[in-house]
């Protein structure tokens, strides 16, 4: 990459003050609304058990019903309200013209409840997959002029779509962490042990006693083993992220690729943040309640240091004269992301909690919505009295914004599951979830290749839209093929 274009590109993505809280929330709401739209259309026109929709055709239709509207919303933002209103009206009107009665509301309450309480939750799969899809789309789209500058990552203060995307990726990882699922895992293991003991008891009471003692001893040994090897397990599990972080760092330096230094620093990148956040959890093995409290204390202390001990001035103005100061943004913002992860484990525990009725799930969705509003009010108070929101520092305002917007999206996703009675994730969501890390890595590689093959910031609108849509389709298609072939891509 020649130096002149590199400087032009860096200037192109720099100096952004961001968008508004509501515009960001509005755009992100489009994904779950698109899922509702897709389900209603499928239930109306493709609800035939004798002639089920071919999987390949389903994938293509889902891409146009769910992914394409999001691409349109982030490139032509003025279309967003029309897309949302149009989809909602369609959901109300289209079933009226169906040849047979379409039952959308509570189609199968028992089955819906069973699957809402299962380990694999469709609404959570869709949330995580679409966070990743949105992230992959935006990391390329931001390099084109068709992508509004206000949606790109902010320079220092402000809030934007891409700012929220970064924190949402961290939060989505926390939601499905072992710590979040621990209570459900323990219940399943306990139930399995009880069933085994009952079976043994039927065979022989004596052997049952022996087996029970053996089982207890084995469990105790496994517990000791898990504690002693947790750190090594976490390091091994996060090794791919750390390796990718080093590979990205080396490549960007060696090929003179454009960098936004104020984002994470001179050497740090988002792969390091994700890896270190997960590894840190090995030292902080608490239950979800304590983790949430620790997360709150951590972000409050961090904000106090930013305001009262000159940490803000250090991050924004201190010269990059040693390894730590060269990467001050990445190192300091790590604290904010860790707080998001710790609080996220508590949210995940609530999501995985077994509920006895759909009414309880409706109450839970309402509780999430109210919590979202509370965090929004706290965010406003933080903006006025404490500090402006900053992704660069991952401060208190940033954490509150991440929690507010994501809890709002969770509540919508759960309500859509309750309304449609459809508990299965879409084909695209299921496919992306199988190989999330690989899709994210591939998205980064393709983004780099596209930036090297053309001067993206000078591309006309038509060419930009074709490239962004084709790139997204290629990622989704590969994810779909890997899932169809039952292939998991791992590097360890």
UniProtKB/Swiss-Prot annotation:
GO terms for cellular component: endoplasmic reticulum membrane. Pathway: Glycolipid biosynthesis; glycosylphosphatidylinositol-anchor biosynthesis. It is an enzyme of class 2 (transferase). Belongs to the PIGW family. This is Phosphatidylinositol-glycan biosynthesis class W protein. The chain crosses the membrane at residues 26-46, 59-79, 82-102, 127-147, 156-176, 264-284, 290-310, 331-351, 364-384, 399-419, 437-457, 464-484. Probable acetyltransferase, which acetylates the inositol ring of phosphatidylinositol during biosynthesis of GPI-anchor. It comes from Dictyostelium discoideum (Social amoeba). Residues 205-216 have a biased composition (Low complexity). The lineage of its organism: Eukaryota, Amoebozoa, Evosea, Eumycetozoa, Dictyostelia.
């Amino acid at each position: 990459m020649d130096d002149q274009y590199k400087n032009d590109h860096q200037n192109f993505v720099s100096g952004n003050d961001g968008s508004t809280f509501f515009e960001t929330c509005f755009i992100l709401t489009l994904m779950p609304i698109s899922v509702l739209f897709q389900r209603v259309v499928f239930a109306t026109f493709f609800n035939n058990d004798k002639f089920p929709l071919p999987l390949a055709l389903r994938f293509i239709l889902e891409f146009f019903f769910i992914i394409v509207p999001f691409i349109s919303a982030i490139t032509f933002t003025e279309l967003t309200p029309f897309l949302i209103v149009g989809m909602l009206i369609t959901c109300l009107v289209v079933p009226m013209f169906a040849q047979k009665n379409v039952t959308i509301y509570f189609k199968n309450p028992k089955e819906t409840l069973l699957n809402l309480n299962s380990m694999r939750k469709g609404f959570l799969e869709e949330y995580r997959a679409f966070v990743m899809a949105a992230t992959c789309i935006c990391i390329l789209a931001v390099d084109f002029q068709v992508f509004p500058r206000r949606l790109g990552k902010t320079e220092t203060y402000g809030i934007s779509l891409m700012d929220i995307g970064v924190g949402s990726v961290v939060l989505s990882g926390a939601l499905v962490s072992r710590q979040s699922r621990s209570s459900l895992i323990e219940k399943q293991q306990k139930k399995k042990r009880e069933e085994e003991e009952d079976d043994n008891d039927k065979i022989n009471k004596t052997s049952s006693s022996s087996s029970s003692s053996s089982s207890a001893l084995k469990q105790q040994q496994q517990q000791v083993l898990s504690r002693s090897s947790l750190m090594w397990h976490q390091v091994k599990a996060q090794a791919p992220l750390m390796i990718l972080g080093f590979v990205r760092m080396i490549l960007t330096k060696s090929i003179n690729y454009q960098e936004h230094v104020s984002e994470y620093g001179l050497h740090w990148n988002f792969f390091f943040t994700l890896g270190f956040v997960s590894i840190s959890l090995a030292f902080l093995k608490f239950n979800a309640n304590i983790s949430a409290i620790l997360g709150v204390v951590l972000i409050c202390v961090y904000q106090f240091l930013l305001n009262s001990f000159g940490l803000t001035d250090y991050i924004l103005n201190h010269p990059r004269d040693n390894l730590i100061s060269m990467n001050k943004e990445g190192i300091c913002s790590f604290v904010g992301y860790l707080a998001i992860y710790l609080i996220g484990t508590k949210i995940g525990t609530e999501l995985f909690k077994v509920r006895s009725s759909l009414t309880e799930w409706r109450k839970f969705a309402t509780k999430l919505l109210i919590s979202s509003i509370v965090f929004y009010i706290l965010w406003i108070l933080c903006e006025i009295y404490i500090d402006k929101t900053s992704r660069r520092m991952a401060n208190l305002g940033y954490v509150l914004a991440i929690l507010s917007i994501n809890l709002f999206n969770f509540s919508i996703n759960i309500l859509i599951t309750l309304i449609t009675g459809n508990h299965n994730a879409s084909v695209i969501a299921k496919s992306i979830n199988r190989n999330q890390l690989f899709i994210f890595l591939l998205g980064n590689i393709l983004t780099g290749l596209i930036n090297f093959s053309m001067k993206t910031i000078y591309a006309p609108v038509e060419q930009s839209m074709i490239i962004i849509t084709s790139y997204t389709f290629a990622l989704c298609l590969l994810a779909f093929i890997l899932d169809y072939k039952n292939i998991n891509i791992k590097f360890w």
